[in-house]
Design a protein with these regions (language model features):
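Terminal-region recognition feature
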Residues: 2-206, 212, 224
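Short acidic/polar capping segments at secondary-structure boundaries
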Residues: 211-214, 234-235
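Short glycine/serine/threonine-rich phosphate/pyrophosphate-binding segments
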Residues: 214-221
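Gly/Pro- and small hydrophobic-enriched strand-loop and loop-to-helix capping segments
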Residues: 225-235
Length: 235
Protein backbone atom coordinates (compact mmCIF):
# COMPACT_ATOMS: atom_id res chain seq x y z
CA UNK A 1 0.00 0.00 0.00
CA UNK A 2 2.86 2.34 0.81
CA UNK A 3 4.43 1.57 -2.59
CA UNK A 4 1.11 2.22 -4.35
CA UNK A 5 0.69 5.52 -2.48
CA UNK A 6 4.24 6.57 -3.35
CA UNK A 7 3.73 5.72 -7.03
CA UNK A 8 0.48 7.67 -7.03
CA UNK A 9 2.15 10.72 -5.50
CA UNK A 10 5.01 10.50 -8.02
CA UNK A 11 2.49 10.39 -10.85
CA UNK A 12 0.66 13.43 -9.50
CA UNK A 13 3.92 15.35 -8.92
CA UNK A 14 5.54 14.47 -12.25
CA UNK A 15 2.61 14.61 -14.65
CA UNK A 16 -0.53 16.22 -13.25
CA UNK A 17 0.96 19.16 -11.33
CA UNK A 18 3.16 20.44 -14.23
CA UNK A 19 0.22 20.21 -16.65
CA UNK A 20 -2.04 22.19 -14.33
CA UNK A 21 0.69 24.83 -13.85
CA UNK A 22 1.31 25.03 -17.59
CA UNK A 23 -2.39 25.37 -18.37
CA UNK A 24 -2.89 28.06 -15.72
CA UNK A 25 0.19 29.97 -16.88
CA UNK A 26 -0.96 29.88 -20.50
CA UNK A 27 -4.43 31.12 -19.62
CA UNK A 28 -3.21 33.89 -17.33
CA UNK A 29 -0.52 35.13 -19.73
CA UNK A 30 -2.21 34.79 -23.13
CA UNK A 31 -5.79 35.75 -22.33
CA UNK A 32 -6.04 39.54 -22.37
CA UNK A 33 -9.26 39.33 -20.32
CA UNK A 34 -7.61 37.25 -17.57
CA UNK A 35 -7.37 38.80 -14.11
CA UNK A 36 -3.90 37.35 -13.47
CA UNK A 37 -0.59 37.17 -15.30
CA UNK A 38 2.77 35.57 -14.65
CA UNK A 39 6.15 37.27 -14.44
CA UNK A 40 9.48 35.92 -15.68
CA UNK A 41 10.37 35.48 -11.99
CA UNK A 42 7.45 32.96 -11.92
CA UNK A 43 5.37 35.09 -9.57
CA UNK A 44 1.64 35.20 -10.17
CA UNK A 45 0.48 38.83 -10.35
CA UNK A 46 -2.96 40.41 -10.21
CA UNK A 47 -3.17 42.53 -13.38
CA UNK A 48 -4.72 45.57 -11.70
CA UNK A 49 -1.99 45.60 -9.05
CA UNK A 50 0.66 45.28 -11.76
CA UNK A 51 -0.80 48.15 -13.79
CA UNK A 52 -1.05 50.34 -10.68
CA UNK A 53 2.68 49.74 -10.25
CA UNK A 54 3.19 51.00 -13.84
CA UNK A 55 3.53 47.38 -15.00
CA UNK A 56 6.74 46.78 -13.04
CA UNK A 57 6.89 43.53 -11.08
CA UNK A 58 7.11 44.42 -7.36
CA UNK A 59 9.21 41.31 -6.71
CA UNK A 60 11.92 41.30 -9.39
CA UNK A 61 11.53 44.74 -11.01
CA UNK A 62 10.84 43.29 -14.46
CA UNK A 63 9.18 45.79 -16.82
CA UNK A 64 6.15 44.18 -18.46
CA UNK A 65 5.08 45.31 -21.92
CA UNK A 66 2.44 48.00 -22.20
CA UNK A 67 0.10 48.68 -25.10
CA UNK A 68 0.07 52.27 -26.42
CA UNK A 69 -3.23 53.03 -24.67
CA UNK A 70 -1.92 51.66 -21.37
CA UNK A 71 1.12 53.94 -21.69
CA UNK A 72 -1.08 56.92 -22.51
CA UNK A 73 -3.20 56.32 -19.40
CA UNK A 74 -0.05 56.36 -17.27
CA UNK A 75 1.58 59.27 -19.11
CA UNK A 76 -1.11 61.92 -19.64
CA UNK A 77 -2.65 64.11 -16.94
CA UNK A 78 -5.81 62.52 -15.47
CA UNK A 79 -5.60 59.76 -18.13
CA UNK A 80 -7.11 62.24 -20.60
CA UNK A 81 -5.94 62.13 -24.22
CA UNK A 82 -7.15 62.00 -27.82
CA UNK A 83 -6.06 59.32 -30.27
CA UNK A 84 -5.21 60.94 -33.61
CA UNK A 85 -6.42 59.38 -36.83
CA UNK A 86 -3.42 58.60 -39.04
CA UNK A 87 -3.19 57.80 -42.78
CA UNK A 88 -3.48 54.11 -43.65
CA UNK A 89 -1.79 53.09 -46.94
CA UNK A 90 -2.99 50.16 -49.02
CA UNK A 91 -2.28 46.80 -47.40
CA UNK A 92 0.29 44.39 -48.84
CA UNK A 93 1.39 46.15 -52.06
CA UNK A 94 3.98 43.40 -52.64
CA UNK A 95 1.45 40.54 -52.25
CA UNK A 96 3.84 38.98 -49.72
CA UNK A 97 3.37 35.47 -48.40
CA UNK A 98 5.51 33.15 -46.28
CA UNK A 99 3.93 30.48 -44.07
CA UNK A 100 0.89 32.76 -44.01
CA UNK A 101 -0.35 35.60 -46.20
CA UNK A 102 0.70 39.05 -45.00
CA UNK A 103 -2.92 40.21 -45.24
CA UNK A 104 -3.88 37.43 -42.81
CA UNK A 105 -1.16 38.53 -40.37
CA UNK A 106 -2.45 42.11 -40.54
CA UNK A 107 -6.04 40.99 -39.98
CA UNK A 108 -5.07 38.92 -36.93
CA UNK A 109 -2.91 41.72 -35.47
CA UNK A 110 -5.74 44.23 -35.88
CA UNK A 111 -8.23 41.92 -34.20
CA UNK A 112 -5.87 41.25 -31.28
CA UNK A 113 -4.80 44.86 -30.67
CA UNK A 114 -7.76 46.89 -31.97
CA UNK A 115 -5.21 49.05 -33.82
CA UNK A 116 -4.81 49.74 -37.54
CA UNK A 117 -1.02 49.27 -37.29
CA UNK A 118 1.94 49.20 -34.90
CA UNK A 119 2.20 52.93 -34.08
CA UNK A 120 -0.48 54.97 -32.30
CA UNK A 121 -0.34 58.77 -31.95
CA UNK A 122 -2.12 60.69 -29.20
CA UNK A 123 -2.42 64.25 -27.98
CA UNK A 124 -2.92 65.37 -24.39
CA UNK A 125 -1.35 67.24 -21.50
CA UNK A 126 1.58 66.41 -19.25
CA UNK A 127 1.85 68.66 -16.19
CA UNK A 128 -0.47 71.07 -18.01
CA UNK A 129 1.70 71.22 -21.16
CA UNK A 130 0.30 70.08 -24.53
CA UNK A 131 2.28 67.09 -25.80
CA UNK A 132 2.09 64.89 -28.89
CA UNK A 133 2.97 61.30 -28.05
CA UNK A 134 3.59 58.20 -30.14
CA UNK A 135 3.95 54.60 -29.03
CA UNK A 136 4.64 51.27 -30.69
CA UNK A 137 2.79 48.08 -29.84
CA UNK A 138 5.00 44.98 -29.87
CA UNK A 139 1.87 42.83 -30.07
CA UNK A 140 1.28 44.20 -33.59
CA UNK A 141 3.69 42.07 -35.67
CA UNK A 142 6.55 42.77 -33.29
CA UNK A 143 6.01 46.54 -33.41
CA UNK A 144 7.67 46.43 -36.82
CA UNK A 145 8.09 49.50 -39.01
CA UNK A 146 6.16 49.41 -42.27
CA UNK A 147 4.42 51.95 -44.50
CA UNK A 148 1.45 52.49 -42.17
CA UNK A 149 3.65 52.83 -39.08
CA UNK A 150 5.88 55.25 -40.99
CA UNK A 151 2.85 57.34 -41.99
CA UNK A 152 1.68 57.42 -38.38
CA UNK A 153 5.10 58.57 -37.16
CA UNK A 154 5.28 61.37 -39.76
CA UNK A 155 1.71 62.40 -38.92
CA UNK A 156 2.70 62.65 -35.25
CA UNK A 157 5.62 64.91 -36.10
CA UNK A 158 3.44 67.10 -38.34
CA UNK A 159 0.89 67.42 -35.54
CA UNK A 160 3.63 68.41 -33.09
CA UNK A 161 5.01 71.06 -35.48
CA UNK A 162 1.57 72.50 -36.33
CA UNK A 163 0.65 72.77 -32.64
CA UNK A 164 4.16 73.67 -31.42
CA UNK A 165 4.14 70.64 -29.13
CA UNK A 166 7.04 68.59 -27.80
CA UNK A 167 7.04 65.12 -29.38
CA UNK A 168 7.54 62.12 -27.10
CA UNK A 169 7.90 58.64 -28.55
CA UNK A 170 7.88 55.23 -26.83
CA UNK A 171 9.75 52.79 -29.08
CA UNK A 172 9.11 49.04 -28.88
CA UNK A 173 10.05 47.18 -32.04
CA UNK A 174 12.04 44.38 -33.60
CA UNK A 175 12.90 46.62 -36.56
CA UNK A 176 11.70 47.07 -40.15
CA UNK A 177 8.81 44.87 -41.32
CA UNK A 178 10.23 42.16 -43.56
CA UNK A 179 6.88 41.60 -45.32
CA UNK A 180 7.21 45.08 -46.85
CA UNK A 181 10.84 44.77 -47.95
CA UNK A 182 12.24 48.02 -49.44
CA UNK A 183 9.03 49.89 -48.59
CA UNK A 184 9.74 49.27 -44.92
CA UNK A 185 13.37 50.37 -45.30
CA UNK A 186 12.19 53.63 -46.89
CA UNK A 187 10.40 54.48 -43.64
CA UNK A 188 13.75 54.72 -41.90
CA UNK A 189 14.79 57.58 -44.20
CA UNK A 190 11.37 59.24 -44.01
CA UNK A 191 11.34 59.13 -40.22
CA UNK A 192 14.85 60.62 -39.99
CA UNK A 193 13.80 63.48 -42.29
CA UNK A 194 10.71 63.99 -40.13
CA UNK A 195 12.82 64.26 -36.98
CA UNK A 196 15.03 66.79 -38.81
CA UNK A 197 11.94 68.94 -39.52
CA UNK A 198 10.97 68.75 -35.85
CA UNK A 199 14.41 69.96 -34.82
CA UNK A 200 14.31 72.78 -37.40
CA UNK A 201 11.14 73.93 -35.65
CA UNK A 202 13.10 73.99 -32.34
CA UNK A 203 10.73 71.52 -30.70
CA UNK A 204 11.91 68.91 -28.19
CA UNK A 205 12.03 65.29 -29.32
CA UNK A 206 12.18 62.79 -26.46
CA UNK A 207 12.52 59.04 -27.02
CA UNK A 208 11.79 56.42 -24.38
CA UNK A 209 13.32 53.14 -25.54
CA UNK A 210 11.43 50.16 -24.15
CA UNK A 211 12.09 46.43 -24.31
CA UNK A 212 12.85 45.65 -27.11
CA UNK A 213 14.05 48.44 -29.39
CA UNK A 214 16.12 46.99 -32.20
CA UNK A 215 17.08 46.97 -35.87
CA UNK A 216 15.96 49.71 -38.22
CA UNK A 217 13.98 51.53 -35.54
CA UNK A 218 17.09 51.94 -33.37
CA UNK A 219 19.11 52.92 -36.44
CA UNK A 220 16.63 55.64 -37.43
CA UNK A 221 14.18 57.71 -35.38
CA UNK A 222 14.61 55.95 -32.01
CA UNK A 223 18.26 56.94 -31.80
CA UNK A 224 17.79 60.62 -32.65
CA UNK A 225 16.07 62.02 -29.58
CA UNK A 226 17.30 65.20 -27.93
CA UNK A 227 16.81 63.15 -24.78
CA UNK A 228 17.04 59.34 -24.81
CA UNK A 229 15.58 57.37 -21.92
CA UNK A 230 16.08 53.61 -21.76
CA UNK A 231 13.98 51.13 -19.84
CA UNK A 232 15.71 47.90 -18.68
CA UNK A 233 16.58 45.49 -21.55
CA UNK A 234 15.61 48.12 -24.13
CA UNK A 235 18.52 47.27 -26.46
Amino acid sequence: KRIEKKNCMNWITKFIKPKIKSLFKKRSSDNKDALWTTCECKNLLYKDDLFNNISVCPTCGSHHKLSPEERFKIFFDNKEYTILETPLPKDDPLKFSDTKKYTERLKKAREQTNQSDAIVIANGKLEGINVTVGAQNFSFIGGSLGAAAGEAFIHGIQHAIENKNPFVFFSCSGGARMQESAIALMQMTRSVLGVHELKKANLPYIVVMTNPTAGGVTASFAGLGDILIGEPKAI
